[in-house]
Structures are given as structure tokens and as C-alpha cells.
Curated annotation (Swiss-Prot):
Taxonomic source organism: Rattus norvegicus
Xref: InterPro entries: PH-like_dom_sf, PH-like_domain, PH_domain, PHLDB1/2/3_PH
GO biological process, one term: regulation of microtubule cytoskeleton organization
Domain PH per the UniProt entry, residue ranges: 721-824
Biased composition (Polar residues): 39-51
Compositionally biased spans, kind Low complexity: 421-442
Name this polypeptide is given: Pleckstrin homology-like domain family B member 1
UniProt xrefs under Pfam families: PH (PF00169)
């Protein structure tokens, strides 16, 4: 029994143990049913539990197939709640199994105790020699219960141990039958002996005892038969239990093989996953190395681009300074040019003033000449009137004959009308009679024709009965009015802006005006001479009354200077003939044509001079307008330049202010650092433990290793006996930016050089040993914007302080001890 219970406990619990407990519990109290046999396994599924297979009726034994594992731990390994539930369920099943095993153990002990009591009650010595299986069988028969699974397991185990001798269980049952027969024989013999001993007793008593013995014997025989039947049933149950155990063993063996196959499969999958993991790690490492190389390449490219950008910025700064200096020089030159031009403009203004004064004097002279001519004209007109009256009185009212002098008068009137061309020509009506003209001609004076405010109206008012031609008077008044307007404009005109002395346009305009003025004067003189010659030439050819107009047209009028007069001659050839009466034409001037400087010629010359003066003034106005336009454009250009210079000045002021603030801030930082250094002067060289070594046979690597540094374990430094190489991050001198540089400490060249990269092709700087004064740790954190202040150290030279950042603390210590061996500028120890 102990072996059976132990074998049951050592067997691994099946996942379907909770499902098979119910039929097991039922089998402990009830008898074995006929259906509960091996023949009921016909349609059993190989994936069902062995207890379910025992309930089925089938005679054939199939190859065991692994059962389906439900609620396996491999299915719920990802869910923590399911794992906790699985653990709790398994614990409850184990507790329930332990409780059932305890109950079975108590029941078996009870059965054994009953068997022992029964054996003692029988008193047969042979019964004590029966094996425990017989006692258990008898106890089971008395208890009337089905043997438990533990007992069946014990019987199966004992049966398996006796299979080597063959038929052990059959011998057990035979010995049990023999013991039963012996018991019966003993009972019979004991009964017979008791009968023989009590034969002498009374018959009634004997009969009663015989009956009692017979009844008891009948009961014993009945019990014996029952026990035999029970023994046979138990034998069948034992055989069935053996078959069930064998089948369960086969099922467990199949399940074990299936689990082993799954285990091998999972083992192979795990090996494959391990190989994949190794390959993945290798690929990741390769990718990481590739990315590191790419990053290093990009970093180098970025450093190169940044250096180029800094160079461009410095170059742009220099170009801006040069441009600023050029602008300042240009500004100075422009200021000098402006001063020169102002001087030239002052000179031109003075010249223009002189020209205006000369023009005013010339106009005044011409006005005086005109007044004198008008006075002479008035005198001649008065003479003419007197002559007409005398001729009229002498001839009895007959007019003067029309002679060449009358034609000259007509020509002079025509010329005066042409000189007054800005005013429209009007046809005059016939003048009043000579009687009326003689009465009003004496009233005409120089003041009336000269400078009256409204000379035309006054002349017409006073000339109502005069014989003076009205068109001629209007022409003279128009000339005087234009002269007065020109003088008023000159007086009212504000002083023009002076032309630039170096402006070629203004100078050219003035020269052109002067040249045109001279040409106009020459043309006026030539025309006056030509007209005078033409008039005197026409007087030498007398003509009849009928042929005079044609002679007038071809001999005199074709000498007019412009085609406009010729074109208008067809329409207005005799416009001025109506200014006088027919008798006045015949009795016109008799002595006027004999003078070389007639009043009409003088008035014509004065009209030409006034036109030229007006033209000159117009050209002066145009020159002033051109000068104003040029000055405005020049002023705009100067304003743009001034704005650009002002913007540049403001920008420079801002830069200077920022520079001053930065200088002040740096000065404060320097003062603070000096104060801290004065307080901590003892820590000026915290890690420089060695003095510079100038020996030729000095081994740098041995020296560093003897100092306690792990050179071989530090991958950031490449150290040999004479040279030390590695990357350091250095702060720039002018531009405070941090750059990664490849440093080379060479004891043969006695220099500390740094390059762009480890190829050592582009040298960025050299520090000679004689210039290195100190090497110390930056304990004051004075490096601006250091990438790693904890790994920053300083290399002090004669003219500069280098800030460097090492990639690791060990590399920083190695570099400091390496560089200090070449600090030959540190001469304080010699004192």
C-alpha cells in the first residue's frame, strides 16, 4: 500500500486531473458496474483522459496518442492574470488530491484493522500467514466497498514485482482457496469433536446445540460462498485494474513521447531563434558601425562646412570694413565736390546777375532811344500836318500826289505791324477828316505814347480826330507793354538756384544763350542794313499809279526776313492803307525818306531788340528749369547716399554698443576670475605633477604607464614612445566655437599640432614646446559653453590660453601628463 500511494504521488499531475476527479470519487463508494470494464473502450479518443477511456467499452488496444493539452502554461504565458488563475487552480487540485489520499489511507487502515480483527476472531494460525492482499480482500468483502485506486496501484505494483516468477497472482488466489477449505475442515472437525464430547449430555440440550451448530455451519457456509463470490469479483476487479493501469501507462508513455517530440521541436525552434538573435545582433552591430562611420564622415563634413562658413564670415566682415572705408572716402570726396560746385554756382550766379543788369541797362537804353524816336516822329507828324494844311489852302483842297515817299510810309507801317505780331491785326476804319486830325494831332505827346498805365486806351481817346495811324500807335504801345512786363518779371523773379560749377549742362546752356544772343544781334544789324538799302534802292525807280503795287510787292516786300510776312501780304497788302485818308497818302511825308536814320527804321530796330531780349529771357528760364531738374536729381542721389551712410552709421553704432557691452561683460568675468584665482592660487596647477623633460632618450609611453595610467584600456589615445595622438575638442581663439580636432604631441618635432582629422593632411595650428607654460584642469569652469565642463583642461602659452575637452576622464589625465612633459615655457621651477 505504501508503494502504491508513493507511486501515485510521484506521478506528474495531468492537466485534466480536475475533470477526472468526479468519476473517481464515485468509484470509491459504489461497486464495479458491468459497463466499467475494458471492453467499453470501443470509440475512445486517444486524446481523452485514461479514466474516460476506462469508461468506454472496447476490446482493442490502440497505439496511444498524446492527449490535447488544454489550459497549458505555454498558452497563457503572456497574461499575468491567467498565470495567477492557473497557479491557484493547480494548488487547489493538489490540496484536493492530498485530502483524497489521506481519506484513502484512513479507509485502507480501517480495512486492514477489520481484516486483522477478523483473522483474530477466526483464531486459525494459517490465516495469519495469508498475504496482506488476502486480508485486504477479506476486509473489502466485509466492508462491501470497491478497493481504492491506491490499493489497486499497490496490487498492480506487487503483481508487477512478481511477474518474473510467472502466475503470482494465480497462486495467491489458490492459496486463499486452500486456506478457506482448511478453515471449513477445522470447523467441521471441531464440530464433530464437540459432538463426541457432548454425547453424554441430555438429548434436548444436545439437539439444541446441534441445531445451533448446524445453523451456524449453514451461516458459515453461506458466508464462505459469499466470500468466494466476492473473491472472484475482486479478482476480476484486480485484473481490470491491472489492464487499466497498463493502458494508463501506455497513454502516459505516448503522452511522454509526444511531449518529448514537442520539447525537441521547441528546442530546435529555440536554437533557430538563438541563431537569428545572433545574426540580428551581428547585423545591428554592423549597422551601428556603419552609422558611426557615416556620422563621423558627416561630422567631418559639418566641421569643414562650419570652418568655411566662419572663413566666409570673416571675409565678409573684412569686405564690409573695406566697403565702409571706401564709402567714407567717397563721402569726403563728395563733400569736397559739393563745396567746389557751390563755389562755381556762386560764380555763375554773379555772372547771371551781371547779365541781367546788362539786359536791364540795354532795355533802358532802347526805351530812351524809342522815346526820342517817338518825339521825332511826333514832330515830323506835326510838320506833315502843317504841310497838308498849307497845301490844302494853296491848292484849294486837292490832296498830295502819291509818290515813293508814301510807299515808304506804307512799308514802315507794315513793318511796325509785323513787329507787333503777338497782338491780333485789326482793320481800322477810315480816319476822320483832315480838319479833325489837325485839331487833335497837337495833343499827342511822348507821355501818351510812352509810359502811361494804359497807353492804348489813352491813345485812342486822345486820337479820336487825329490823323496818326492807329495801328502804328497800337504797335508801339504793345512793345512798351511787353517791355514793362519783362522788367516786372525780372524784378519779381526770385534768385534762381545756382548751377553747379562742374555741371556741363548748365555751362553749355549759358554759352549757347550767349552765342545765340550775339547771332541775333548780328542778324538784326544785317536785316536793318538790308532794309535800309532796299528802301533807298526802291526810291530811285519812279513808277506810275497803275504799276506801283506790283513794284512794291517785288522790290520791297520780298526782302522781309520771314515767310509769314510774305504769306500775309496777299491778304493784308493794303491793311495799313486805311490808316490815312486818300489825300493823306498823296500828301504824306515829303522829307522823311531823305534821312538815313528815319524814325521808322529806329522803331523797327528797337522791336527786334525787344524780341531778342524776350527770347534770351525765355532761354534763361529754360536753363534755370534744366538746372533745377539737375539739382533735384543730384539732391535725390545725395539723399539716397546720405540715407545709406546713415544706415551704415547706425549699424556700426549698434555693433559698437554690442561690442562695448560684450567687452564690459568679459572684463567683469576676467575680474571675477582673477579674484577667484587670487583666493585659490594654491590650486593653479592641480594635476601637473611632473616637470618638463628635455632628455633625448625619454620614453613617453613608459613614463605615462609608470604614472598609473591604463594606456592600453584607453581607446581615445594612441601613445608611443615619442608621439601621442588622439581627438580633442578645442575652443576657437577669435570665434568662441568648439571644434573637434586631431592632436599630435610629437617629441621629435617638439610641437603640439592639431589637424582637421586623423589623416593629418590639413594642419590647423601648431603649439611649440617653448611656448607651453602651464597645463591644468579647468576647476574654475572658465571655458565658455564647454561641451563637458568636467572634462575640460587648459593649456597656457605665452600669447594664448587653449581650452580643450577630452572624450573621457582617463584620456584627459593622460593628455595632461603628456603635454606637461613638453611645457618648456614653464620656467618657474628653475627659480
Amino acid at each position: 500500500l505504501t508503494l502504491g500511494a508513493r507511486g501515485r504521488r510521484t506521478r506528474s499531475p495531468s492537466p485534466t486531473l480536475g475533470e477526472s476527479l468526479a468519476p473517481r470519487k464515485g468509484s470509491f463508494s459504489g461497486r464495479l458496474s458491468p459497463a466499467y470494464s475494458l471492453g467499453s473502450l470501443t470509440g475512445a479518443s486517444p486524446r481523452q483522459s485514461p479514466h474516460a477511456q476506462r469508461k468506454l467499452s472496447s476490446g482493442d488496444l490502440r497505439v496511444p496518442i498524446p492527449r490535447e493539452r488544454k489550459n497549458s502554461i505555454t498558452e497563457i504565458s503572456d497574461n499575468e492574470d491567467d498565470l495567477l488563475e492557473y497557479h491557484r487552480r493547480q494548488r487547489q487540485e493538489r490540496l484536493r488530491e492530498q485530502e483524497m489520499e489521506r481519506l484513502e489511507r484512513q479507509r485502507l487502515e480501517t480495512i486492514l484493522n477489520l481484516c486483522a480483527e477478523y483473522s483474530r476472531a477466526d483464531g486459525g494460525p494459517e490465516t495469519g500467514e495469508l498475504p496482506s492482499i488476502g486480508e485486504a480482500t477479506a476486509a473489502l468483502a466485509l466492508a462491501g466497498r470497491r478497493p481504492s485506486r491506491g490499493l489497486a496501484g499497490a496490487i498492480v505494483v506487487s503483481g508487477r514485482s512478481g511477474e518474473e516468477s510467472g502466475g503470482a497472482s494465480q497462486r495467491l488466489w489458490e492459496s486463499m482457496e486452500r486456506s478457506d477449505e482448511e478453515n471449513l475442515k477445522e470447523e467441521c472437525s471441531s464440530t464433530e469433536s464437540t459432538q463426541q464430547e457432548h454425547e453424554d449430555a441430555p438429548s434436548t440440550k444436545l439437539q439444541g446445540e446441534v441445531l445451533a451448530v448446524e445453523e451456524e455451519r449453514a451461516q458459515v457456509l453461506g458466508r464462505v460462498e459469499q466470500l468466494k463470490v466476492r473473491v472472484k469479483e475482486l479478482e476480476q476487479q484486480l485484473q481490470e485494474a491491472a489492464r487499466e493501469a497498463e493502458m494508463e501507462r501506455a497513454l502516459l508513455q505516448g503522452e511522454r513521447e509526444a511531449e518529448r517530440a514537442l520539447l525537441q521541436k521547441e528546442q530546435r525552434a529555440m536554437d533557430q531563434l538563438q541563431e537569428k538573435l545572433v545574426a540580428l545582433e551581428t547585423g545591428i552591430q554592423k549597422e551601428r558601425d556603419k552609422e558611426a562611420d557615416a556620422l563621423e564622415t558627416e561630422t567631418k563634413l559639418f566641421e569643414d562646412l562650419e570652418f568655411q562658413q566662419l572663413e566666409r564670415e570673416s571675409r565678409v566682415e573684412e569686405e564690409r570694413e573695406l566697403a565702409g572705408q571706401g564709402l567714407l572716402r567717397s563721402k569726403a570726396e563728395l563733400l569736397r565736390s559739393v563745396s567746389k560746385r557751390k563755389e562755381r554756382l556762386a560764380v555763375l550766379d554773379s555772372q547771371a546777375g551781371q547779365i541781367r543788369a546788362q539786359a536791364v541797362q540795354e532795355s533802358e537804353r532802347l526805351a530812351r532811344e524809342k522815346n526820342a524816336v517817338l518825339q521825332l516822329l511826333q514832330k515830323e507828324k506835326e510838320k506833315l500836318t502843317v504841310l497838308e494844311r498849307r497845301y490844302h489852302s494853296l491848292t484849294g483842297g486837292r490832296p498830295f500826289p502819291k509818290t515813293t515817299s508814301t510807299l515808304k510810309e506804307v512799308y514802315r507801317s507794315k513793318m511796325n505791324g509785323d513787329m507787333a505780331s503777338p497782338l491780333p491785326r485789326t482793320r481800322s476804319g477810315p480816319l476822320p477828316s483832315s480838319s479833325g486830325s489837325s485839331s487833335s494831332s497837337s495833343q499827342l505827346s511822348v507821355a501818351t505814347l510812352g509810359r502811361s498805365p494804359s497807353p492804348k486806351s489813352a491813345l485812342l481817346a486822345q486820337n479820336g480826330t487825329s490823323s496818326l495811324p492807329r495801328n502804328l500807335a497800337a504797335t508801339l504801345q504793345d512793345i512798351e507793354t511787353k517791355r514793362q512786363l519783362a522788367l516786372q518779371q525780372k524784378v519779381e523773379l526770385p534768385p534762381a538756384e545756382p548751377l553747379s560749377p562742374e555741371d556741363p549742362a548748365g555751362h553749355q546752356v549759358i554759352e549757347e544763350q550767349r552765342r545765340r544772343l550775339a547771332e541775333l544781334k548780328q542778324k538784326a544789324a544785317a536785316e536793318a542794313q538790308c532794309q535800309w538799302d532796299a528802301l533807298h534802292g526802291a526810291a530811285a525807280f519812279p513808277a506810275g499809279p497803275s504799276g506801283f503795287p506790283t513794284l512794291m510787292h517785288h522790290s520791297i516786300l520780298h526782302h522781309l526776313p520771314a515767310g509769314r510776312e510774305r504769306g500775309e501780304e496777299g491778304e493784308h497788302a493794303y491793311d495799313t492803307l486805311s490808316l490815312e485818308s486818300s489825300d493823306s497818302m498823296e500828301t504824306s511825308i515829303s522829307t522823311g525818306g531823305n534821312s538815313a536814320c528815319s524814325p521808322d527804321n529806329m522803331s523797327s530796330a528797337s522791336g527786334l531788340d525787344m524780341g531778342k531780349i524776350e527770347e534770351m529771357e525765355k532761354m534763361l528760364k529754360e536753363a534755370h528749369a534744366e538746372k533745377s531738374r539737375l539739382m533735384e536729381s543730384r539732391e535725390r542721389e545725395m539723399e539716397l547716399r546720405r540715407q545709406a551712410l546713415e544706415e551704415e552709421r547706425r549699424r556700426r553704432e549698434q555693433v559698437e554698443r554690442r561690442l562695448q557691452s560684450e567687452s564690459a561683460r568679459r572684463q567683469q568675468l576676467v575680474e571675477k576670475e582673477v579674484k577667484l584665482r587670487e583666493k585659490q592660487f594654491s590650486q593653479a596647477r592641480p594635476l601637473t605633477r611632473y616637470l618638463p623633460n628635455r632628455k633625448e632618450d625619454f620614453d613617453l609611453k613608459t613614463h605615462i604607464e609608470s604614472s598609473g595610467h591604463g594606456v592600453d584600456t584607453c581607446l581615445h589615445v594612441v601613445l608611443s614612445s615619442k608621439v601621442c595622438r588622439g581627438y580633442l575638442i578645442k575652443m576657437g581663439g577669435k570665434i568662441k566655437s568648439w571644434k573637434k580636432r586631431w592632436f599630435v604631441f610629437d617629441r621629435l618635432k617638439r610641437t603640439l599640432s592639431y589637424y582637421v582629422d586623423k589623416h593629418e593632411t590639413k594642419l590647423k595650428g601648431v603649439i611649440y614646446f617653448q611656448a607651453i607654460e602651464e597645463v591644468y584642469y579647468d576647476h574654475l569652469r572658465s571655458a565658455a559653453k564647454s561641451p563637458n565642463p568636467a572634462l575640460t583642461f587648459c593649456v597656457k602659452t605665452h600669447d594664448r590660453l587653449y581650452y580643450m575637452v577630452a572624450p573621457s576622464a582617463e584620456a584627459m589625465r593622460i593628455w595632461m601628463d603628456v603635454i606637461v612633459t613638453g611645457a618648456e615655457g614653464y620656467t618657474q621651477f628653475m627659480n
